[in-house]
Amino acid sequence: MKQFEIVTQPIETEQYRDFTINERQGAVVVFTGHVREWTKGIRTQHLEYEAYIPMAEKKLAQIGKEIEEKWPGTITTIVHRIGPLQISDIAVLIAVSSPHRKAAYAANEYAIERIKEIVPIWKKEIWEDGAEWQGHQKGTYNEAKKGKAR
């Protein structure tokens, strides 16, 4: 188990969260992204994720370093699952701790946006009537676009 990794087995939230806990941290924000059944009115049967693992893990660690630079004192753990995932399975876990909650919340949101922008992970959405590969890389994180639908 590593602080930044790609896995094929179900993600155990508490084990990864514990990477971020120490006596200096007053807040831990944990985000788990799950496979949802409905997307834009289309029913999903399951998802299949693929990644270029060596590069993906390097990019996850890069995001952790970026967070540490933007919010000093934070500790980040990021784990993404690949392979077939069923409805409600955890696809991604991001845990960020900091001395105070505001930085932990902001850094956690930053992490998920950066994953979508720079980490070489692709998902295949399998629906009742077809399937389609989706890429996540969207370019450089832009604080001004935060909160806008993609």
Curated annotation (Swiss-Prot):
Residues involved in substrate binding: 34-36, 44, 100-101, 116, 123-125
Pathway(s) where this gene product acts: Cofactor biosynthesis; molybdopterin biosynthesis
EC number(s) recorded for this UniProt protein: 2.8.1.12
SUPFAM superfamilies: Molybdopterin synthase subunit MoaE (SSF54690)
InterPro entries in the record: MoaE_sf (IPR036563), Mopterin_biosynth_MoaE (IPR003448)
Catalysed reactions, as listed in the record: 2 [molybdopterin-synthase sulfur-carrier protein]-C-terminal-Gly-aminoethanethioate + cyclic pyranopterin phosphate + H2O = molybdopterin + 2 [molybdopterin-synthase sulfur-carrier protein]-C-terminal Gly-Gly + 2 H(+)
GO BP term (any one): Mo-molybdopterin cofactor biosynthetic process
Enzyme category, top tier: transferase
Function: Converts molybdopterin precursor Z into molybdopterin. This requires the incorporation of two sulfur atoms into precursor Z to generate a dithiolene group. The sulfur is provided by MoaD.
Similarity comment text for this entry: Belongs to the MoaE family.
Protein name, entry field: Molybdopterin synthase catalytic subunit
